[in-house]
């Protein structure tokens, strides 16, 4: 490639269609074409422009076809289906000047496609993302499920309110080692850790946190959104250091525990309430609810005492159980 070609070897796209049509840049040289998806849909006209001072000798190719698609500084294509998406390249003198990738975002009957992630249907239908926080520090974890294993890419972004300057930082999505089984089918689980940039744990929340997961599978683009207050996704870790102490002249024992290390402090302000239950092989005793960190229970041989926690003043999720053996 000649030096003068390097200076201006970049690629631009112009969409020639009605005002409601959208084409936008997902990342450098990756563009999303939004399509209404129905039989005999006309598709969208996209004009690709290769920016170079030369007027002649430019050809166009696509990774979807081995043929030369056209010549000249521009190439007009009609994008109707996935066969029209993919990577387009403009060439001159045997050298590639630039490449750009077109991905499709489908809309059927006014609804964007949600084919990549599994609907977990809890706490309501169309719940593709689940998020939890162990405390009020502004740190939270989100996860999602998919049956797809290959040609898959995720990116995550988050913010609190549309104009909040602090923002929320999310790391890269990671694939969990273990599969998740739902309705006799196995799914891959992806998780991401997020942290609010500046937070006051004791402050009343007025703006929702929004998490957006962008998913690309082959040439398909989709996005998924979840909005929440931290207080609505709180799930404490289980109580720690469960211990049993026999009581003199009694068939009962005293079970005691401590707040989890991950819970917000001071505990006098960020208080937990607890649920205690004796679980035998064949039955479970009545649950006891209390604010203190000990209780008296009848502990039968071969039974377990288990304890879980949740926010005392706001109906958070219950933690997982912590347990200790009676034997």
UniProtKB/Swiss-Prot annotation:
Assigned GO CC terms: extracellular space; membrane
Annotated glycan sites: 223
Molecular function as annotated in GO: cytokine activity; cytokine receptor activity
Pfam families reported for this sequence: IL12p40_C
Subunit structure, as described in the record: Heterodimer with IL12A; disulfide-linked. The heterodimer is known as interleukin IL-12. Heterodimer with IL23A; disulfide-linked. The heterodimer is known as interleukin IL-23. Also secreted as a monomer. Interacts with NBR1; this interaction promotes IL-12 secretion.
UniProt protein name: Interleukin-12 subunit beta
Annotated function: Cytokine that can act as a growth factor for activated T and NK cells, enhance the lytic activity of NK/lymphokine-activated killer cells, and stimulate the production of IFN-gamma by resting PBMC.
Keywords on record: Cytokine, Disulfide bond, Glycoprotein, Immunoglobulin domain, Secreted, Signal
Cell location: Secreted
Cystine residue pairs: 50-90
InterPro entries membership: FN3_dom (IPR003961), FN3_sf (IPR036116), Hematopoietin_rcpt_L_F3_CS (IPR003530), Ig-like_dom (IPR007110), Ig-like_dom_sf (IPR036179), Ig-like_fold (IPR013783), Ig_sub2 (IPR003598), IL-12 (IPR050676)
Family the UniProt entry places it in: Belongs to the IL-12B family.
Positions of the Fibronectin type-III domain: 238-327
Domain Ig-like C2-type residue range list: 23-106
Signal peptide, first to last residue: 1-22
Annotated coiled-coil segments of the chain: none
């Amino acid at each position: 490639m000649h030096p003068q070609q390097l200076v201006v070897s970049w690629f631009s796209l112009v969409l020639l269609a009605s005002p409601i049509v959208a084409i936008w840049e997902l990342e450098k040289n990756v563009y999303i074409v939004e399509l209404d998806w129905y039989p005999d849909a006309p598709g969208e006209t996209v004009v690709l422009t290769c920016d170079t001072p030369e007027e002649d000798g430019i050809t166009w190719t696509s990774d979807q076809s081995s043929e030369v698609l056209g010549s000249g500084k521009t190439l007009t294509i009609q994008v109707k289906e996935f066969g029209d998406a993919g990577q387009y390249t403009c060439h001159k003198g045997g050298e590639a000047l630039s490449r750009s990738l077109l991905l499709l975002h489908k809309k059927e009957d006014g609804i964007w496609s949600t084919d990549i992630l599994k609907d977990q249907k809890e706490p309501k239908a169309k719940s593709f993302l689940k998020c939890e926080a162990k405390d009020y520090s502004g740190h939270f974890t989100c996860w999602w499920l998919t049956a797809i294993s290959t040609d898959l890419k995720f990116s995550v972004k988050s913010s609190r309110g549309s104009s909040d300057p602090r923002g929320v930082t999310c790391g890269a999505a990671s694939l969990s080692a273990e599969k998740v089984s739902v309705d006799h089918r196995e799914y891959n689980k992806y998780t991401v850790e997020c942290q609010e940039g500046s937070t006051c744990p004791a402050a009343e929340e007025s703006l929702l946190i929004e998490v957006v997961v962008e998913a690309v599978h082959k040439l398909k683009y989709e996005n998924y959104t979840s909005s929440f207050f931290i207080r609505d996704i709180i799930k404490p870790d289980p109580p720690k250091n469960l211990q049993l102490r026999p009581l003199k002249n009694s068939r009962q024992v005293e079970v005691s525990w401590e707040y989890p290390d991950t819970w917000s402090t001071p505990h006098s302000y960020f208080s937990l309430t607890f649920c205690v239950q004796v679980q035998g092989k064949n039955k479970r005793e009545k649950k006891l609810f209390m604010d203190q960190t000990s209780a008296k229970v009848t502990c039968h041989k071969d039974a377990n005492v288990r304890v879980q926690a949740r926010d005392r003043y706001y109906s958070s999720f219950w933690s997982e159980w912590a347990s200790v053996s009676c034997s």
